[in-house]
Protein backbone atom coordinates (compact mmCIF):
# COMPACT_ATOMS: atom_id res chain seq x y z
CA UNK A 1 0.00 0.00 0.00
CA UNK A 2 1.52 3.34 -1.05
CA UNK A 3 1.74 6.53 0.94
CA UNK A 4 -0.79 8.03 -1.47
CA UNK A 5 -3.28 5.37 -0.43
CA UNK A 6 -2.77 6.27 3.20
CA UNK A 7 -3.34 9.96 2.48
CA UNK A 8 -6.54 9.35 0.53
CA UNK A 9 -9.69 10.96 1.90
CA UNK A 10 -11.32 8.61 4.42
CA UNK A 11 -14.59 8.27 6.24
CA UNK A 12 -14.57 8.85 9.99
CA UNK A 13 -14.69 5.08 10.59
CA UNK A 14 -11.89 4.50 8.12
CA UNK A 15 -9.79 7.19 9.79
CA UNK A 16 -10.31 5.60 13.21
CA UNK A 17 -9.24 2.26 11.73
CA UNK A 18 -5.83 3.85 11.22
CA UNK A 19 -5.75 4.69 14.91
CA UNK A 20 -5.63 8.39 14.13
CA UNK A 21 -8.27 9.63 16.56
CA UNK A 22 -5.78 11.08 19.02
CA UNK A 23 -3.63 12.54 16.25
CA UNK A 24 -6.62 14.38 14.84
CA UNK A 25 -7.57 15.65 18.28
CA UNK A 26 -4.10 17.02 18.72
CA UNK A 27 -3.86 18.57 15.28
CA UNK A 28 -7.41 19.84 14.97
CA UNK A 29 -10.32 18.79 12.82
CA UNK A 30 -8.86 20.52 9.75
CA UNK A 31 -5.54 18.65 9.86
CA UNK A 32 -6.68 15.11 9.06
CA UNK A 33 -4.30 14.69 6.08
CA UNK A 34 -1.37 15.87 8.21
CA UNK A 35 -2.36 13.43 10.95
CA UNK A 36 -2.48 10.55 8.48
CA UNK A 37 0.90 11.53 7.11
CA UNK A 38 2.26 11.51 10.65
CA UNK A 39 0.82 8.05 11.20
CA UNK A 40 2.44 6.89 7.99
CA UNK A 41 5.82 8.24 9.12
CA UNK A 42 5.47 6.25 12.33
CA UNK A 43 4.77 3.11 10.32
CA UNK A 44 7.74 3.72 8.03
CA UNK A 45 9.96 4.38 11.06
CA UNK A 46 8.82 1.13 12.61
CA UNK A 47 9.85 -0.75 9.49
CA UNK A 48 13.28 0.80 9.82
CA UNK A 49 13.46 -0.41 13.40
CA UNK A 50 13.04 -3.95 12.13
CA UNK A 51 16.48 -3.85 10.46
CA UNK A 52 19.11 -6.35 11.73
CA UNK A 53 20.27 -5.60 15.27
CA UNK A 54 23.57 -6.14 17.01
CA UNK A 55 23.51 -9.46 18.83
CA UNK A 56 22.26 -9.09 22.40
CA UNK A 57 21.27 -12.25 24.29
CA UNK A 58 18.70 -10.27 26.28
CA UNK A 59 16.81 -9.02 23.20
CA UNK A 60 13.81 -10.79 21.68
CA UNK A 61 12.07 -10.34 18.34
CA UNK A 62 8.75 -11.73 17.18
CA UNK A 63 6.73 -11.48 13.99
CA UNK A 64 3.00 -11.93 14.60
CA UNK A 65 0.36 -12.08 11.89
CA UNK A 66 -3.32 -11.13 12.22
CA UNK A 67 -5.76 -13.49 10.55
CA UNK A 68 -8.90 -15.53 11.10
CA UNK A 69 -9.71 -19.21 10.70
CA UNK A 70 -11.30 -22.26 12.25
CA UNK A 71 -10.65 -24.29 15.40
CA UNK A 72 -12.34 -27.16 17.23
CA UNK A 73 -14.61 -27.39 20.26
CA UNK A 74 -16.53 -30.56 21.20
CA UNK A 75 -19.74 -30.37 19.14
CA UNK A 76 -23.17 -30.20 20.67
CA UNK A 77 -25.10 -33.42 19.96
CA UNK A 78 -27.39 -32.91 17.02
CA UNK A 79 -26.12 -29.37 16.48
CA UNK A 80 -27.99 -26.18 17.34
CA UNK A 81 -27.68 -24.13 14.18
CA UNK A 82 -24.82 -22.20 15.76
CA UNK A 83 -22.40 -25.00 16.69
CA UNK A 84 -20.96 -26.87 14.89
CA UNK A 85 -20.82 -24.16 12.24
CA UNK A 86 -21.96 -25.67 8.92
CA UNK A 87 -19.52 -23.44 7.03
CA UNK A 88 -16.48 -24.78 8.89
CA UNK A 89 -14.07 -26.90 6.85
CA UNK A 90 -13.49 -30.39 8.27
CA UNK A 91 -12.25 -31.24 10.86
CA UNK A 92 -12.94 -27.83 12.45
CA UNK A 93 -16.23 -26.34 13.66
CA UNK A 94 -15.68 -22.92 15.32
CA UNK A 95 -14.75 -19.56 13.78
CA UNK A 96 -12.17 -17.35 15.48
CA UNK A 97 -9.78 -14.41 15.13
CA UNK A 98 -6.20 -14.47 16.37
CA UNK A 99 -2.48 -13.90 15.99
CA UNK A 100 -0.01 -16.39 14.50
CA UNK A 101 3.72 -16.56 15.15
CA UNK A 102 5.38 -16.30 11.73
CA UNK A 103 8.83 -15.35 12.99
CA UNK A 104 11.48 -16.36 10.46
CA UNK A 105 9.06 -17.09 7.62
CA UNK A 106 9.51 -15.42 4.24
CA UNK A 107 6.93 -12.91 3.04
CA UNK A 108 5.54 -15.50 0.64
CA UNK A 109 5.28 -18.08 3.43
CA UNK A 110 3.55 -15.56 5.70
CA UNK A 111 0.91 -14.90 3.06
CA UNK A 112 0.27 -18.64 2.80
CA UNK A 113 -0.75 -18.68 6.48
CA UNK A 114 -3.69 -16.32 5.97
CA UNK A 115 -6.84 -17.99 7.26
CA UNK A 116 -4.85 -20.34 9.53
CA UNK A 117 -5.46 -18.79 12.92
CA UNK A 118 -4.01 -19.82 16.30
CA UNK A 119 -5.99 -20.01 19.56
CA UNK A 120 -4.70 -18.90 22.00
CA UNK A 121 -2.19 -16.56 20.45
CA UNK A 122 1.54 -17.40 20.70
CA UNK A 123 3.34 -17.11 24.04
CA UNK A 124 6.00 -14.37 23.93
CA UNK A 125 9.18 -14.75 26.01
CA UNK A 126 11.51 -11.89 26.87
CA UNK A 127 14.18 -10.94 29.42
CA UNK A 128 14.50 -8.09 31.91
CA UNK A 129 16.94 -5.46 30.66
CA UNK A 130 16.48 -6.52 27.06
CA UNK A 131 14.54 -5.05 24.18
CA UNK A 132 11.39 -6.69 22.85
CA UNK A 133 10.28 -5.99 19.30
CA UNK A 134 6.99 -7.38 18.01
CA UNK A 135 6.27 -6.80 14.33
CA UNK A 136 2.56 -7.07 13.61
CA UNK A 137 1.41 -7.79 10.05
CA UNK A 138 -2.28 -7.35 9.28
CA UNK A 139 -3.12 -9.80 6.49
CA UNK A 140 -6.86 -9.39 6.94
CA UNK A 141 -9.40 -12.18 7.15
CA UNK A 142 -10.06 -15.06 4.76
CA UNK A 143 -13.62 -15.86 5.87
CA UNK A 144 -14.57 -12.19 6.25
CA UNK A 145 -12.58 -10.17 3.69
CA UNK A 146 -15.09 -7.36 4.18
CA UNK A 147 -13.68 -6.78 7.70
CA UNK A 148 -10.86 -4.37 6.90
CA UNK A 149 -10.36 -3.42 10.54
CA UNK A 150 -7.08 -2.22 11.91
CA UNK A 151 -5.42 -4.29 14.64
CA UNK A 152 -2.94 -3.64 17.42
CA UNK A 153 -0.82 -5.28 20.11
CA UNK A 154 -1.56 -3.96 23.59
CA UNK A 155 1.03 -5.13 26.16
CA UNK A 156 -1.39 -5.50 29.08
CA UNK A 157 0.15 -4.42 32.38
CA UNK A 158 3.30 -2.92 30.88
CA UNK A 159 3.91 0.65 32.13
CA UNK A 160 4.60 1.96 28.64
CA UNK A 161 5.17 5.72 28.56
CA UNK A 162 5.30 5.84 24.73
CA UNK A 163 1.75 6.04 23.32
CA UNK A 164 2.89 4.98 19.83
CA UNK A 165 3.66 1.50 21.16
CA UNK A 166 0.78 1.14 23.62
CA UNK A 167 -1.63 -0.39 21.12
CA UNK A 168 -4.67 1.69 22.12
CA UNK A 169 -5.71 2.97 18.68
CA UNK A 170 -7.43 6.12 19.93
CA UNK A 171 -4.09 7.21 21.42
CA UNK A 172 -1.58 5.62 19.08
CA UNK A 173 -1.62 3.72 15.77
CA UNK A 174 -3.81 0.91 14.52
CA UNK A 175 -2.20 -1.32 11.89
CA UNK A 176 -4.30 -1.09 8.69
CA UNK A 177 -5.03 -4.00 6.38
CA UNK A 178 -1.95 -4.90 4.33
CA UNK A 179 0.47 -3.12 6.64
CA UNK A 180 3.10 -4.03 9.23
CA UNK A 181 4.16 -2.14 12.33
CA UNK A 182 6.89 -2.87 14.88
CA UNK A 183 6.23 -2.35 18.58
CA UNK A 184 9.23 -1.66 20.80
CA UNK A 185 9.54 -2.21 24.56
CA UNK A 186 12.43 -1.80 26.97
CA UNK A 187 11.83 -4.34 29.73
CA UNK A 188 12.52 -3.53 33.38
CA UNK A 189 10.17 -5.69 35.46
CA UNK A 190 9.99 -9.51 35.39
CA UNK A 191 6.63 -11.20 35.66
CA UNK A 192 3.64 -12.63 33.83
CA UNK A 193 1.88 -10.26 31.45
CA UNK A 194 -0.68 -10.54 28.68
CA UNK A 195 -1.27 -9.02 25.27
CA UNK A 196 -4.34 -8.52 23.15
CA UNK A 197 -5.72 -6.52 20.27
CA UNK A 198 -7.09 -3.20 21.55
CA UNK A 199 -8.89 -2.25 18.34
CA UNK A 200 -12.65 -2.78 18.80
CA UNK A 201 -11.33 -4.64 21.79
CA UNK A 202 -14.56 -6.14 23.16
CA UNK A 203 -15.09 -8.07 19.94
CA UNK A 204 -11.46 -8.84 19.15
CA UNK A 205 -10.63 -10.07 22.67
CA UNK A 206 -13.77 -12.19 22.79
CA UNK A 207 -12.97 -13.61 19.35
CA UNK A 208 -9.58 -14.88 20.55
CA UNK A 209 -6.93 -12.19 19.97
CA UNK A 210 -5.23 -12.83 23.33
CA UNK A 211 -1.87 -14.19 24.46
CA UNK A 212 0.67 -14.33 27.30
CA UNK A 213 4.03 -12.58 27.72
CA UNK A 214 6.68 -13.79 30.17
CA UNK A 215 9.47 -11.43 31.21
CA UNK A 216 12.25 -13.39 32.91
CA UNK A 217 14.72 -11.86 35.38
CA UNK A 218 18.18 -11.27 33.92
CA UNK A 219 19.77 -12.80 37.04
CA UNK A 220 18.45 -16.28 36.25
CA UNK A 221 15.89 -17.42 33.65
CA UNK A 222 14.81 -20.21 36.02
CA UNK A 223 13.53 -17.72 38.59
CA UNK A 224 10.07 -16.16 38.39
CA UNK A 225 11.32 -12.90 39.92
CA UNK A 226 14.61 -11.41 41.10
CA UNK A 227 14.79 -13.68 44.13
CA UNK A 228 16.22 -17.19 44.41
CA UNK A 229 13.16 -18.09 46.47
CA UNK A 230 11.20 -18.09 43.19
CA UNK A 231 13.43 -20.70 41.51
CA UNK A 232 11.63 -23.40 39.54
CA UNK A 233 12.39 -26.54 37.55
CA UNK A 234 9.38 -26.40 35.22
CA UNK A 235 6.90 -23.73 34.16
CA UNK A 236 3.48 -23.76 32.55
CA UNK A 237 1.35 -21.03 30.99
CA UNK A 238 -2.40 -21.20 31.62
CA UNK A 239 -4.45 -18.52 29.86
CA UNK A 240 -8.16 -18.56 30.69
CA UNK A 241 -10.83 -17.55 28.21
CA UNK A 242 -14.41 -18.08 27.07
CA UNK A 243 -16.19 -18.85 23.81
CA UNK A 244 -19.70 -17.70 23.00
CA UNK A 245 -20.60 -19.83 19.99
CA UNK A 246 -23.49 -17.56 19.01
CA UNK A 247 -20.99 -14.73 18.53
CA UNK A 248 -18.62 -16.98 16.57
CA UNK A 249 -21.40 -18.11 14.24
CA UNK A 250 -22.66 -14.58 13.71
CA UNK A 251 -19.16 -13.28 13.01
CA UNK A 252 -18.61 -15.94 10.33
CA UNK A 253 -22.06 -15.45 8.78
CA UNK A 254 -22.08 -11.64 8.70
CA UNK A 255 -24.75 -11.35 11.37
CA UNK A 256 -25.02 -8.87 14.24
CA UNK A 257 -25.28 -9.87 17.89
CA UNK A 258 -26.09 -7.95 21.07
CA UNK A 259 -23.22 -7.79 23.57
CA UNK A 260 -25.68 -7.27 26.41
CA UNK A 261 -26.70 -10.90 25.82
CA UNK A 262 -23.15 -12.24 26.28
CA UNK A 263 -23.57 -15.87 27.32
CA UNK A 264 -20.48 -18.06 26.77
CA UNK A 265 -21.00 -21.79 26.51
CA UNK A 266 -17.37 -22.99 26.51
CA UNK A 267 -14.64 -22.09 29.04
CA UNK A 268 -11.07 -22.59 27.87
CA UNK A 269 -7.52 -23.00 29.12
CA UNK A 270 -4.97 -22.19 26.41
CA UNK A 271 -7.74 -22.21 23.82
CA UNK A 272 -8.92 -25.76 24.57
CA UNK A 273 -11.55 -27.35 26.80
CA UNK A 274 -11.29 -30.50 28.89
CA UNK A 275 -10.47 -33.26 28.03
CA UNK A 276 -8.59 -31.74 25.07
CA UNK A 277 -6.56 -29.68 27.56
CA UNK A 278 -4.64 -32.91 28.26
CA UNK A 279 -3.62 -33.50 24.64
CA UNK A 280 0.05 -32.80 23.75
CA UNK A 281 1.32 -29.61 22.16
CA UNK A 282 0.97 -29.28 18.40
CA UNK A 283 2.61 -27.20 15.67
CA UNK A 284 0.33 -25.04 13.48
CA UNK A 285 2.64 -25.75 10.53
CA UNK A 286 2.16 -29.53 10.70
CA UNK A 287 -0.88 -31.78 11.02
CA UNK A 288 -0.92 -33.56 14.42
CA UNK A 289 -2.36 -36.94 15.40
CA UNK A 290 -5.60 -35.13 16.15
CA UNK A 291 -5.79 -32.77 13.15
CA UNK A 292 -8.71 -30.80 14.61
CA UNK A 293 -6.32 -29.38 17.27
CA UNK A 294 -3.71 -28.16 14.77
CA UNK A 295 -4.48 -24.49 15.41
CA UNK A 296 -4.89 -24.86 19.18
CA UNK A 297 -1.27 -25.80 19.80
CA UNK A 298 -0.84 -25.23 23.54
CA UNK A 299 -1.42 -28.11 25.94
CA UNK A 300 -2.49 -27.41 29.53
CA UNK A 301 -1.26 -30.72 30.95
CA UNK A 302 1.15 -30.09 33.85
CA UNK A 303 3.84 -32.75 34.30
CA UNK A 304 6.71 -32.91 36.79
CA UNK A 305 8.93 -35.22 38.81
CA UNK A 306 8.53 -35.70 42.55
CA UNK A 307 10.44 -33.03 44.47
CA UNK A 308 10.59 -30.53 41.61
CA UNK A 309 9.46 -26.93 41.95
CA UNK A 310 6.81 -25.98 39.41
CA UNK A 311 5.81 -22.46 38.36
CA UNK A 312 2.25 -21.90 37.17
CA UNK A 313 1.78 -18.64 35.27
CA UNK A 314 -1.92 -18.14 34.88
CA UNK A 315 -3.87 -15.21 33.54
CA UNK A 316 -7.45 -14.37 32.60
CA UNK A 317 -8.38 -12.59 29.38
CA UNK A 318 -12.00 -13.64 29.37
CA UNK A 319 -14.85 -11.46 30.60
CA UNK A 320 -15.81 -13.52 33.65
CA UNK A 321 -14.23 -13.93 37.08
CA UNK A 322 -12.95 -17.46 37.62
CA UNK A 323 -11.89 -19.50 40.68
CA UNK A 324 -9.12 -21.98 39.92
CA UNK A 325 -8.39 -24.75 42.42
CA UNK A 326 -5.85 -27.56 42.82
CA UNK A 327 -6.89 -30.61 44.83
CA UNK A 328 -4.29 -31.96 47.25
CA UNK A 329 -1.45 -29.49 46.64
CA UNK A 330 -0.43 -26.23 48.33
CA UNK A 331 0.24 -23.28 46.03
CA UNK A 332 2.49 -20.40 47.11
CA UNK A 333 1.40 -17.21 45.35
CA UNK A 334 4.62 -15.30 44.67
CA UNK A 335 3.44 -12.73 42.13
CA UNK A 336 0.35 -10.86 41.00
CA UNK A 337 0.00 -8.69 37.91
CA UNK A 338 3.77 -8.92 37.27
CA UNK A 339 4.60 -7.64 40.76
CA UNK A 340 6.65 -9.74 43.19
CA UNK A 341 4.84 -10.32 46.47
CA UNK A 342 7.97 -11.21 48.45
CA UNK A 343 9.99 -8.65 50.43
CA UNK A 344 12.05 -6.12 48.47
CA UNK A 345 14.00 -2.99 49.35
CA UNK A 346 11.08 -0.85 48.21
CA UNK A 347 8.42 -3.07 49.81
CA UNK A 348 9.80 -4.92 52.88
CA UNK A 349 6.50 -6.62 53.73
CA UNK A 350 6.20 -10.26 52.69
CA UNK A 351 2.84 -10.58 50.92
CA UNK A 352 3.25 -14.14 49.63
CA UNK A 353 0.63 -16.59 50.77
CA UNK A 354 -0.28 -20.27 50.51
CA UNK A 355 -3.60 -21.51 49.20
CA UNK A 356 -5.16 -24.23 47.08
CA UNK A 357 -7.36 -21.88 45.05
CA UNK A 358 -7.35 -18.37 43.67
CA UNK A 359 -10.02 -16.05 42.32
CA UNK A 360 -8.83 -14.42 39.12
CA UNK A 361 -10.66 -11.53 37.49
CA UNK A 362 -10.43 -10.45 33.84
CA UNK A 363 -7.08 -8.81 33.16
CA UNK A 364 -5.33 -10.32 36.19
CA UNK A 365 -2.32 -12.63 36.31
CA UNK A 366 -0.88 -14.77 39.12
CA UNK A 367 2.40 -16.63 39.59
CA UNK A 368 2.17 -19.70 41.82
CA UNK A 369 4.85 -22.18 42.93
CA UNK A 370 4.38 -25.67 44.30
CA UNK A 371 6.75 -28.49 45.18
CA UNK A 372 5.69 -31.80 43.67
CA UNK A 373 5.02 -34.38 46.41
CA UNK A 374 6.57 -37.83 46.57
CA UNK A 375 5.23 -40.37 44.13
CA UNK A 376 2.86 -42.92 45.64
CA UNK A 377 4.65 -45.84 44.04
CA UNK A 378 1.47 -46.95 42.28
CA UNK A 379 1.26 -46.51 38.52
CA UNK A 380 3.38 -44.42 36.19
CA UNK A 381 2.28 -41.11 37.75
CA UNK A 382 -0.01 -39.60 40.38
CA UNK A 383 -2.80 -37.29 39.24
CA UNK A 384 -4.02 -34.07 40.87
CA UNK A 385 -6.94 -32.15 39.37
CA UNK A 386 -6.63 -28.46 38.56
CA UNK A 387 -10.05 -26.99 37.76
CA UNK A 388 -12.48 -24.10 38.02
CA UNK A 389 -14.50 -24.53 41.22
CA UNK A 390 -17.34 -22.60 39.61
CA UNK A 391 -18.83 -25.94 38.71
CA UNK A 392 -21.26 -24.50 36.17
CA UNK A 393 -18.22 -23.84 33.96
CA UNK A 394 -16.99 -27.46 34.07
CA UNK A 395 -19.00 -28.56 31.06
CA UNK A 396 -18.94 -28.10 27.32
CA UNK A 397 -22.09 -26.30 26.16
CA UNK A 398 -24.18 -28.00 28.84
CA UNK A 399 -23.34 -31.49 27.62
CA UNK A 400 -23.07 -34.35 30.16
CA UNK A 401 -19.68 -35.09 31.68
CA UNK A 402 -16.76 -32.88 32.59
CA UNK A 403 -15.46 -30.18 30.29
CA UNK A 404 -14.42 -26.55 30.35
CA UNK A 405 -11.58 -25.20 32.48
CA UNK A 406 -10.01 -28.35 33.88
CA UNK A 407 -6.65 -30.04 33.47
CA UNK A 408 -4.36 -32.38 35.41
CA UNK A 409 -1.08 -32.22 37.30
CA UNK A 410 0.80 -35.49 36.84
CA UNK A 411 3.66 -36.26 39.24
CA UNK A 412 6.18 -38.84 38.04
CA UNK A 413 8.71 -40.69 40.23
CA UNK A 414 11.70 -39.08 38.48
CA UNK A 415 11.29 -40.56 35.02
CA UNK A 416 10.73 -37.29 33.13
CA UNK A 417 13.67 -35.64 31.34
CA UNK A 418 14.36 -31.92 31.93
CA UNK A 419 11.73 -29.60 30.49
CA UNK A 420 12.85 -28.33 27.05
CA UNK A 421 10.38 -25.41 26.99
CA UNK A 422 7.34 -24.14 28.92
CA UNK A 423 4.26 -26.39 28.69
CA UNK A 424 6.34 -29.37 27.46
Regions found by a protein language model. Give the residues of each.
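Active-site-proximal structural scaffolding
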Residues: 8, 21-25, 190, 206, ...
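Non-cytosolic beta-sheet module surface loops
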Residues: 136-138, 187, 314-316
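Compositionally biased low-complexity segments at domain edges in trafficked proteins
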Residues: 227-252, 423-424
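Long, repeat-rich segments with strong aromatic
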Residues: 303-324
Amino acid sequence: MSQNNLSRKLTRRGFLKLGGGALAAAAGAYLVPQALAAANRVLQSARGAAAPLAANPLDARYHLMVTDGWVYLPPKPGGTGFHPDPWAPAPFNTYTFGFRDVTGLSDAAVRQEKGKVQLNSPVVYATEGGELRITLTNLGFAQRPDLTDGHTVHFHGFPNAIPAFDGVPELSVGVPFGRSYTYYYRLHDPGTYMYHCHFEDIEHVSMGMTGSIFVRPADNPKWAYKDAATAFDREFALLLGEVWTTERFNAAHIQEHDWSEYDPDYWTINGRVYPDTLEPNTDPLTVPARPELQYQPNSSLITCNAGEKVLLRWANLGFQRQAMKVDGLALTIVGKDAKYLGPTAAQPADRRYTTDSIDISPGESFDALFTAPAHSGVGAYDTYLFYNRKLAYLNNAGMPGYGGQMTEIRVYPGTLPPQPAPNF
